[in-house]
Amino acid sequence: MFGGKGGLGNLMKQAQQMQEKMQKMQEEIAQLEVTGESGAGLVKVTINGAHNCRRVEIDPSLLEDDKEMLEDLVAAAFNDAARRIEETQKEKMASVSSGMQLPPGFKMPF
């Protein structure tokens, strides 16, 4: 079931190594900053890996337009940044599990 002699011990060792790699990767992701944009770059929102907003940049030309449009652009830029950070997290976490000999049908929780 676990690849013969020493298979279970080897699997446990791999699991521990993967856990250590995931811990390190989560710490790295928390430090990441990603910028999302909307309105062809007129609004930019920068968030970190914990989805905390770090910075909002608004082109001065938008300050003369209606408030509702500006609010929509800020929300869209934040959503773009959140999508980008999610993609980055998935890519980094997938790299942690590459090379591991997982049982058939086993899926990672990310």
Swiss-Prot record:
GO terms for molecular function: DNA binding. Signal peptide: none annotated. Its main location: cytoplasm. It is found in: Cytoplasm, Nucleoid. Gene3D superfamilies: Nucleoid-associated protein YbaB-like domain. The keyword DNA-binding applies. SUPFAM superfamilies: YbaB-like. InterPro entries: YbaB-like_sf, YbaB/EbfC. GO terms for cellular component: bacterial nucleoid; cytosol. Coiled coil: none annotated. Keywords: Cytoplasm, DNA-binding. Pfam families: YbaB_DNA_bd (PF02575). Residues 89-110 are annotated as: Disordered. Homodimer. Belongs to the YbaB/EbfC family. Binds to DNA and alters its conformation. May be involved in regulation of gene expression, nucleoid organization and DNA protection. NCBIfam families: DNA_YbaB_EbfC. This is Nucleoid-associated protein ESA_02800. It comes from Cronobacter sakazakii (strain ATCC BAA-894).
